[in-house]
């Protein structure tokens, strides 16, 4: 071009590595032998009810440093299965330049993160999970992408509107990232082919769609949903609804038992309704009000005033016919500028009295309430 040559990573690169010396990311030509899936006939449909363990491969190890796919397969998966879970939800699968983003500032949507190992080692992790009877769900980030030019797809053709709306409309200011323009054919093709790729090449059993609320609305959900009009006015991103409907149709056409979960806090009607009834087609919605409720109880309400009827009401507050993933906490509460339920309950006492030889009322209370919260949820 007029300004000289510029090296960029292809949008569809399936292997991206970071140079240890320069720290630059580059695409790698990667053509391995066909992966041996052996007798992998696993089907998530065998599980009537999902018991989901959320995990980050890099942070799952006890040792200092970044964990690997192999370590996770050998050491962590057997523990998850032994503890009674039947599904693993993996964070930070697609490549991302900033490790501290927990995988949510994605740069290469088709490349599994090389920090944790090779693509074949990720496939080995999924094969091992299936051998243990565990389904594997990918935390899929199609709500935004990293604004970095060197590592990502931003301004890939020299403009700011190849994959995004032009100008400020293409920015997600709350997340310091770029938005997709779901009304563009090249965006639909890019993202839908990404879903097909992860399902067929890696045999994931489903997806948790991250940031669905941000996708559904041009205001990204930063308003009070105080009337029904909020779900049907000009703030709704119709292109995103079309894309999410196509995504669900494709995923379920490719694999009828595929599980799709929507991270939506707005309560958009129809998000989990069948497409034959005019819905978007998600199988589950995340029960995002539940963790906030437990935090409020712990921080603001004395133990003796916890109301069992109120707890039951919050746990069962959902639209008729909408299957909901209930959870006490996730990375949003435990990692992203917050703290775990256990730390809220036991605080600094955890560092000195988490052993059977110590008698400590703070620890005893914390453990009892922690068990009760998990049981209720």
Regions found by a protein language model. Give the residues of each.
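Generic low-polarity alpha-helical segments
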Residues: 1-2, 198, 377
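The feature marks proteins involved in alpha-glucan
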Residues: 1-53, 59, 64
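Glycine-rich, flexible loop/turn motifs
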Residues: 5, 98-100, 105-106, 112, ...
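Charged, low-complexity, helix/coiled-coil-prone segments
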Residues: 9-24, 63-76, 131-144, 182-195, ...
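A broad, low-specificity signal for short, low-complexity segments enriched in glycine/proline
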Residues: 11-20, 97-99, 167-170, 283-292, ...
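Substrate-binding/active-site clefts of carbohydrate-active enzymes
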Residues: 17, 40-52, 56-236
């Amino acid at each position: 071009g007029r300004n000289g040559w510029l090296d960029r990573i292809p949008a569809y690169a399936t292997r991206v590595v970071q140079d240890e010396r320069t720290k630059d990311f580059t695409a790698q030509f990667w053509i391995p032998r066909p992966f041996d899936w052996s007798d992998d006939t696993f089907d998530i449909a065998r599980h009537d009810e999902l018991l989901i363990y959320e995990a980050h491969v890099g942070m799952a190890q006890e040792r200092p440093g970044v964990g690997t796919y192999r370590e996770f397969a050998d050491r962590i998966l057997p523990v998850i299965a032994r503890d009674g879970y039947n599904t693993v939800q993996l964070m930070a699968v697609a490549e991302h330049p900033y490790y501290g983003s927990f995988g949510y500032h994605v740069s290469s949507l088709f490349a599994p993160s090389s920090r944790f190992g090779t693509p074949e080692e990720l496939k080995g992790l999924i094969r091992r999970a299936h051998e243990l009877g565990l389904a594997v769900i990918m935390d899929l980030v199609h709500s935004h992408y990293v604004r970095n030019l060197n590592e990502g797809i931003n301004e890939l053709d020299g403009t700011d509107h190849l994959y995004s709306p032009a100008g400020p409309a293409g920015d997600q200011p709350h997340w310091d990232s770029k938005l997709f323009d779901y009304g563009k054919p090249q965006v639909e093709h890019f993202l839908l082919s990404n879903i097909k790729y992860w399902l067929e090449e890696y045999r994931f059993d489903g997806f948790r769609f991250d940031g669905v609320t941000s996708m559904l609305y041009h205001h990204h959900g930063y308003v009070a949903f105080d009337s029904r009009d909020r779900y049907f006015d000009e703030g709704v991103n119709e292109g995103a609804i079309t894309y999410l409907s196509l995504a669900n149709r494709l995923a379920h056409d490719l694999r009828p038992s595929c599980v799709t979960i929507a991270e939506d806090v707005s309560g958009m009607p129809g998000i989990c309704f069948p497409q034959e009834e005019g819905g978007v087609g998600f199988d589950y919605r995340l029960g995002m009000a539940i963790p906030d409720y437990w935090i409020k109880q712990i921080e603001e309400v004395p133990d003796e005033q916890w109301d069992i009827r109120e707890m039951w009401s919050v746990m069962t507050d959902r639209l008729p016919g909408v299957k909901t993933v209930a959870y006490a906490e996730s990375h949003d509460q435990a990692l992203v500028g917050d703290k775990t339920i256990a730390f809220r309950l036991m605080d600094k006492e955890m560092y000195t009295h988490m052993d059977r030889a110590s008698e400590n009322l703070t620890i005893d209370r914390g453990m009892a309430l922690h068990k009760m919260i998990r049981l209720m949820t």
